[in-house]
């Protein structure tokens, strides 16, 4: 586990970290790369070590995508329920990685899964966070048609997080896909309305509107950059910050 930091004051006391399921694949084309899990667990452990309370939401796209199968004829609700189960699988894998690194963690699912996870309870989640446990929120919102990005923003608001940190493969929000357009320009700051007006695709409409309506700051950053997460928590300007008014 990470050692206690000295000489540093964390800017955020409580964060909600959103990881995509694809981030867990590493260099694989499907599933979970244990090396990626272990690296992420150590980075989260560094935050716990300096007293930051961490909530986690992990997508399920590395295992299943309900929307894609719905286009092929599967009932959308059934597909979304299967996607929720994929997020539970990822959450269990992350909990295991954290516990192997001697970091206390709990999985709370929006769908009751007695004997596998705890059922989501806001007050219980807050108690665990205050006890320095990492709380992994699984199964999205528990409802079909809602993305895990929306679930992350919802949980962040419910637990009174200071910020939503969305980990991606690129170091922020760009005018276009930087992998496809070499002339794409990066934004350092944006407002929620700018994200919506420009249709930048940072998150879905529901997620962005939730953050805007509840004044929840959102930072998009590159999780593959070593030390980026810790730098953000210390107040570093990694990636793109989205908030109500630019500072």
UniProtKB/Swiss-Prot annotation:
Cellular component GO terms held in the UniProt record: cytosol
Family membership noted in the UniProt record: Belongs to the UMP kinase family.
Species classification: Bacteria, Pseudomonadati, Pseudomonadota, Gammaproteobacteria, Pseudomonadales
Keyword Nucleotide-binding: yes
This protein's name: Uridylate kinase
EC identifiers of the protein: 2.7.4.22
EC class name: transferase
Main location: cytoplasm
Activity regulation info: Inhibited by UTP.
């Amino acid at each position: 586990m990470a050692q206690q930091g000295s000489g540093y004051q964390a800017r955020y006391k409580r964060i909600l970290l959103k990881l995509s399921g694809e981030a867990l694949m590493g260099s694989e084309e499907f599933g979970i790369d244990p090396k990626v899990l272990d690296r992420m667990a150590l980075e989260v452990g560094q935050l716990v070590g300096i007293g930051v309370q961490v909530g986690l939401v992990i997508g399920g796209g590395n295992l299943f995508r309900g929307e894609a199968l719905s286009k092929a004829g599967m009932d959308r609700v059934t597909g979304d329920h299967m996607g929720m189960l994929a997020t539970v699988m990822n959450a269990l894998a992350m909990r295991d990685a954290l516990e192997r690194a001697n970091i206390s963690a709990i999985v709370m699912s929006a769908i009751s899964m007695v004997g596998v996870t705890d059922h989501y309870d806001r007050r219980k989640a807050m108690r665990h966070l205050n006890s320095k446990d990492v709380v992994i929120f699984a199964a999205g919102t528990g409802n079909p048609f809602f993305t895990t990005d929306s679930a992350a923003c919802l949980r962040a608001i419910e637990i009174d997080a200071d910020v939503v940190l969305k980990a991606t493969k690129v170091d922020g929000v760009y005018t276009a896909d930087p992998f496809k357009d070499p002339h794409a320009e990066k934004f350092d700051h944006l407002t929620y309305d700018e994200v919506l007006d420009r249709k930048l695709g940072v998150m879905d409409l529901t997620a962005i509107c939730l953050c805007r309506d509840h004044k929840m700051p959102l930072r998009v950053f590159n999780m593959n950059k070593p030390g980026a997460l810790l730098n953000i928590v210390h107040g570093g300007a990694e990636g793109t910050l989205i908030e109500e008014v630019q500072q």
